[in-house]
Amino acid sequence: MKKMSYAAFAVVFAALPVHAEELTVATAGDQNMVDYINQYLGPLFEKTYPGNTVRAVGTGPGDAGSQKILERFDAQAAAKSDKWDVDVAVVHEKFVGPMVTKNYLDKYRSDIETGKLVTRANAKMALGTNVDGYVMPMFNSQTAIAYNPAVVPNPPKSYAELADWAKAHPKQFGYNGIKGGASGVSFVMGWIYAFGGGDANTLMNGPFKEDETKKWDTAFKSLADFTTNATLTPGNAGTLDLLSRGEIAMGPVWVDMFYSWQANGQLPPTMKLVLPAPGMPGQPMHYVMPEKAAHKALAEKFIALATSPKVQAEGIVKRFNWYPGIDADNVKRELDDATWNKLFVDISPADLAAKGNPFPIAPYNTAILEAYEKSVK
């Protein structure tokens, strides 16, 4: 998707026809996010609720896409608009906190039937901000350790076991450091959760304490030694590529990318995943609804449909290899055994609930990345 300037973004919204039955959904993310709404979710909603239409407006990939939605909300709040021109937005986790603290969002989750199907902590806290009730996860993306069982018949179940394995098998573990993709960043954050010497829950949920950052010296020294013994890859895809060619036997990956590569024949079907204790970070994208949305009742119906077990199974799991936003056990009955076993045979719903961690809150996240740059050469 081409990047859209803030001015162009505003023009697109201004050009949308105003109809009582038209629901406007703004979504950050790649073009596949817009296509998902325009080609699947929107038509399904229109069929379920005849007479209504859905319009998706894509704001661009990555954090910049969510930033544009936040800026749109800022502009409408500054203009004191009675009704806002976005009914539903899909945004990255880190932008929900500012939206809640600025009182932009409706606390709608308890008003929809699927609200009770959400169990993960990231629907309550978003990088240190209490967002409970304001969000419904569209999906959860997760990192894990991919491995070749022909080389690693008994994969490490914890970071401590992983460190021992890598020491015994030089250059067979590969990761991209903190450049070229967040799979490596996630691995580093998990290392600090495991060996940082402080309280991992404080890193995830706050509050920020400068003293906490001074506990990491030993963890970064051990990570520097570990990295000397590892293979540095060029990025998310680079790790998968080296795995596929047998140049490494283990490395951190995004689970959806892993399964997509397998489905496309780019990765051997024998490759497997493990989520080591105490866990690795992932992140959701959230459905939010502005407090001043023009079509709030319709927006609630849209989000309820989007987070229903059937749609989560067909739209999120089957189409994208993402983990569902609602508790996976509620989706299982809607999936055939082959699909369920593919996505959950290595990492179970219980594993996700226990070890699918959030990234650290922003100040800790920044401090960890800066410390990595200084400590790991």
For each of these PLM feature ranges, what is it?
Residues V345-K377:
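Conserved C-terminal helix/tail region of periplasmic/extracytoplasmic solute-binding proteins
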Residues E21-E93:
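Early extracytoplasmic/lumenal segment of secretory-pathway proteins
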